[in-house]
Amino acid sequence: MILRYNIIMITDQLLAKYPIISDQVDAKELGVLLRELEKVLRSGAAGNIVEFGCYVGTTSLFIRRLLDAYNFAGEFHVYDSFAGLPEKTQADNSAAGEQFKAGELLAPRKTFIQNFKKTGLKLPTIHKGWFADFTPEDVPESIIFAFFDGDFYESIADSFRACDSKFQKRATIIVDDYANEALPGAARAVDEWLRRHPARLTVESSLAIIRR
């Protein structure tokens, strides 16, 4: 019980102290993400962390704060086109998601960097490009925690493809929008990956939590 209390306390302190700088994630979803990361950090696992889809840096800032709170010695890498959403495919079609179009949610790389500089936090390693263009050589070894926020089917599938050979045996993977009817491609990509890889899936808020 003490361990569980400590995990919640650190995450909640961060959420209470610092602002959420965009409307693309809410406090509940962010809390789920941070608590899962904190469990990994508390376990003492050594390795690296990746985030595919960082937008203006909202989640990246909180991830960095939590890593700093634990004196995390591994690498933190973020990946984004910084050019907005890519084109949809058939797998993403949903009447509830008509507002999600190519080019939406555009945030320049310099905006991400400026948001980090305002806080004085250490920048992660930034990779600019479409997820389809990244290869396993672009991601670090020994991934212990991954957050995929690609919105569309191919973006999530490409994130898995790039990281597949780099996940540690007991990695935790969080995928945004798994339970979001407006973005059905995210769930399709996750379900396809799970059919080929033994892992445990739970869903909280709109997030898929995958534990290998």
Regions found by a protein language model. Give the residues of each.
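A short alpha-helical cap/connector motif
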Residues: 1-174, 178-212
